Amino acid sequence: PSVPIVAIVTEKKGVVFAPYNPVWKKQRKFSHSTLRHFGLGKHSLEPKIIEEFKYVKDEILKHGEEQFNPFPIIGNAVSNVICSMAFGRRFDYDDAEFKNMLNLISRVLEVSLNSQVLLVNICPWLYYLPFGPFREFRQSVLDITAFLKNIIRQHRESLDVQYPRDFIDMYLLHSDEEKKINGESSFNEDYLFFIIGDLFIAGTDTTSNTLLWSLLYMSLHPVT
C-alpha cells in the first residue's frame, strides 16, 4: 500500500518505494545488475568492507578505555561502503558535508517516525505547513537532495564513456545510450537521484542498526 509521506517525498520514484510497473521493473533490473557488478552480494565487495573496517578500528582505538557512542562510527562506515559503489569514493569521517548528510538522514528518519509528521499519512496537506517538525522535515529533505544532486552533477561533468567509475556513471551512460537509440528514456538524472536516496536511507539505517545490535550483544556476552 502507498504511504502518503513516502509518496510525497519520493515522488513514487526509485526502487524501494516506487509502484510496481514496467518502469520500476527496468530500473530495478538495471540497479540490481549494476550494483552486483560493483560487488553487492559478492566476495568482491569484501576488500572494500575490510578496508573500511581499518578506519573503524582506528576511530574506536582513539577512545581508549573511555565510554563512547559507536553509532556515528558505524553509520560512517556503512555509508562509505555504499559510497564506494555509488560514488566511486569514500569520505573522511571528519568531512563536514558527509557528516551533515548523515545527520540529516538520521534526523529525517527520527522526525518522520516520532513526531507529528506521522499525521501526514492521515492528512497529506500537513506536509506543507510552514512551521514545527513539518518545516524541519521538508528542509532536511531539501538539504539531502542538494548534496546528492551535486554529486550527480559532478559525475556528469567528469563522465568518461570509456571508464565508468561507479553506479552513477553506469546509470548516466545507460541513460545516454537509450536516449540516443529511442530519443527518450525512463532513465534520467531525476530518477537516479531517488535510487541513490534509496541506497543511502534504506541501506545505511538498516545495516547500521543490525551492526549496532550485534556490537551490543557481543559487549553483553563476550564469552558466548
Q: What does each model-found stretch correspond to?
A:
Residues 1-45, 69, 74-81, 97-126:
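Cytochrome P450 substrate-recognition site 1
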Residues 22-30, 48-55, 77, 100, ...:
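Generic alpha-helical secondary structure signal
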Residues 36-40, 65, 115, 140-211:
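Conserved cytochrome P450 catalytic core segment spanning the I/J/K helices
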Residues 39-51, 61-84, 92-100, 125-147, ...:
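Cytochrome P450
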Residues 45, 49, 151, 155-156, ...:
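Juxtamembrane membrane-interface segments of multi-pass membrane proteins
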Residues 49-53, 74-82, 196, 200, ...:
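Hydrophobic alpha-helical cores of multi-pass transmembrane domains in eukaryotic membrane proteins
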Residues 84-94, 177-179, 218-224:
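Short helix-capping/linker segments at secondary-structure and domain boundaries
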Residues 206-224:
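Cytochrome P450 catalytic-core helices
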